[in-house]
Amino acid sequence: MTSFQEVPLQTSNFAHVIFQNVAKSYLPNAHLECHYTLTPYIHPHSKDWVGIFKVGWSTARDYYTFLWSPMPEQYVEGSTVNCVLAFQGYYLPNDDGEFYQFCYVTHKGEIRGASTPFQFRAASPVEELLTMEDEGNSDMLVVTTKAGLLELKIEKTLKEKEELLKLVSVLEKETAQLREQVGRMERELSHEKSRCEQLQAEQKGLLEVSQSLRVENEEFMKRYSDATSKAHQLEEDIVSVTHKAVEKETELDSLKDKLRKAQQEKEQLECQLKTEKDEKELYKVHLKNTEIENTKLVSEIQTLKNVDGNKESMITHFKEEIGKLQSCLADKENLHRALLLTTSNKEDTLLLKEQLRKAEEQVQATRQELIFLAKELSDAVNVRDKTMADLHTARLENERVKKQLADTLAELQLHAVKTDQEKTDTLEHELRREVEDLKLRLQMAADHYKEKFKECQRLQKQINKLSDQSASSNGVFTKRMGSQQKVNDASINTDPAASASAVDVKPAASCAAETDFDMSAKDHVCEVTKEMAEKVEKYNKCKQLLQDEKAKCNKYADELAQMELKWKEQVRIAENVKLELAELEDSYSLQLAEKDKEINCLASFLENLSREKELTKSLEDQKGRKMEGQSPQQVSRCLNTCSEQSGLLPTLPAAQPVLQYGNPYTAHETRDGADGAFYPDEIQRPPVRGPSWEDNVVCSQPARNLSRPDGLEDPEDSREDENVPIPPDPANQHLRGHGAGFCFDSSFDVHKKCPLCELMFPPNYDQIKFEEHVESHWKVCPMCSEQFPPDYDQQGFERHVQTHFDQNVLNFD
């Protein structure tokens, strides 16, 4: 066996044209239709032709007969086209037992497609008859035709089909109901999901609002921590001041000791003066010493004065610290008010109030500590005043400063209270004043609107009167002109000169009076219209201002109402959302449990239906197998002897997987009626061994057709190649060595069993049919007849078949 070469079917020349519905055999003298498909890999030509070749051909000249391939109508390049050719019966070969195949040859002489092999055989009358047992449970055998048996089977299958259709309609109705239920549940689930998503979005909004409130609370806490840190810093400053005061007190004690020592020394000096009056020198020295001590005391007094100055600076520092504390208290009070205005949460306000109360207590404690320190300082000053007279003034000043500080603190507190009260009073007064102003403006606007309306009516009446007056004046003027014309006509005949002068004067006077009246009327109308326009503009402005004031009032009222109701609504919404989420979770859990139960019920129902179908199928199979009777022994013996004498089994290719355009090397199985009695869906047809063709195959070139295809040599030249033996194929020799295949002996009266599918057959079953069934499990190469096991790879089998065409490349040069 040669090595296989991987060649895709798309690139093979023999797969460009696919022959469809090729039978295993055809009648010799009957018309034959050839169906084939042109793939996108071939471009048709008007000189392309389809020929019948004997299997084993070597060149395109080895055709038996051919027909020109018609050019497809409306052909589009790159598309697939189905074509049909009809071969006449008198051009076809006779029943010679040879295998033939269709080949598509292009105008260049290239073979681009080949069909599966087939034979030309005449039908025998024995093959059309069948024997079967009588249905009346008698031992009689009934001989019928295949057509009758097939009609009975068709009637049975139609009845079964009707029953199955009824069952399918019932099942379809049930499935439609189940689908409706599932769709309804899915719609409910989608509705619930959308509702859940909406609630989740609302919850996210509430969480964002709470987060913003938390951020504000954190900011207030930071401010409070800053204030507490400042208070701690002030406490530390107070502690440092107390330490300094203690140090000063120790210094005062040391000064007191020094003063006592000085007094003792002075007493000693006085004693020495009394005792030693004579010793002037010593007295002078003693005076010098006393002067020195006095200077020291003066310096000490100066130092004490400096200390007093330091105390004053400390007092000023304390005043500044007290001012800072007061500013901190004011800031805390402002923060407290801001918190009361901004936050409506009761718990937060209580916490902040508690924190403010603690801070106020701490401030009060610091104030008390300051008072205690002031008292201690006053005590120290009193002691110092007792010891030194010079420091008495400082003590008085210190007390005065303390009084001033207390006064200032009291004044500041009173001022803060007064300012707060004044602010509230001013706000209330301003709001009341604005409300009263708005009321007055509304009243004034209403009065003004009434006045303007009255003025408009009055002016409208005046305009109507003026228009009437102008119309009447025009009528009078026309009448006067007519009468004047008559007077002028009468005076022409009497006194021409006088009449002429009168005519000249009177018309001029009448025209001047009329024009003056019209001008005054027009001026009056213009003034009235201007006044009306100005008043209308003023009215519109007042109306606009009134609307603006109303809008502002409504806006302020709405904002206050919204600020009051906002937090309550948020709290209520949050509680409702929590309750709804809990209810939704419970409802979802219940719905899921119910749907799981329904799904389990449907699954169990479908399993029961499938089991019932399988049981009905198995019962029908058993009934069909029981209905099949045993064939008569005489017919089986005759058929067995015929098969033993012939010894040749036809090779039938196995069923292959479906390709894109069909496999050109697989035959469409056309099972006869007898084989169809044993469930053709379960019976397959691979071969056991290849056909025992002769080693020396003679290729002849018949001259039936008068015309020959273009591009080929003269048929007379090809006749020289007749009777030339073709060397035997090594694959065929290999198969002949193993040509025994399966040995079927019909002499044993036992049930026949397929060695591959383990299907049981009756003892008298046709041996040829049984062998064909066993052969149907195997795969046979259509070129070399090599057999392959049933589980052999389909691609490997196709590669093997392709190697035969690759090894025998055709040359037309």
Swiss-Prot record:
Alphabetized InterPro entries for the sequence: CALCOCO1-like, CALCOCO1/2_Zn_UBZ1, SKICH, UBA_autophagy_assoc_protein
Its job: Ubiquitin-binding adapter that participates in inflammatory, antiviral and innate immune processes as well as selective autophagy regulation. Plays a key role in the negative regulation of NF-kappa-B and IRF3 signalings by acting as an adapter for the ubiquitin-editing enzyme A20/TNFAIP3 to bind and inactivate its substrates. Disrupts the interactions between the E3 ubiquitin ligase TRAF3 and TBK1/IKBKE to attenuate 'Lys63'-linked polyubiquitination of TBK1 and thereby IFN-beta production.
Gene Ontology CC terms, in alphabetical order: autophagosome; cytoplasm; cytoplasmic vesicle; mitochondrion; phagophore assembly site
Residues given in the record as Zn(2+) 2 binding sites: 781, 784, 800, 804
Protein known as: Tax1-binding protein 1 homolog
Keywords: Apoptosis, Coiled coil, Cytoplasm, Cytoplasmic vesicle, Metal-binding, Mitochondrion, Phosphoprotein, Repeat, Zinc, Zinc-finger
Lineage: Eukaryota, Metazoa, Chordata, Craniata, Vertebrata
Location of the protein in the cell: Cytoplasm; Mitochondrion; Preautophagosomal structure; Cytoplasmic vesicle, Autophagosome
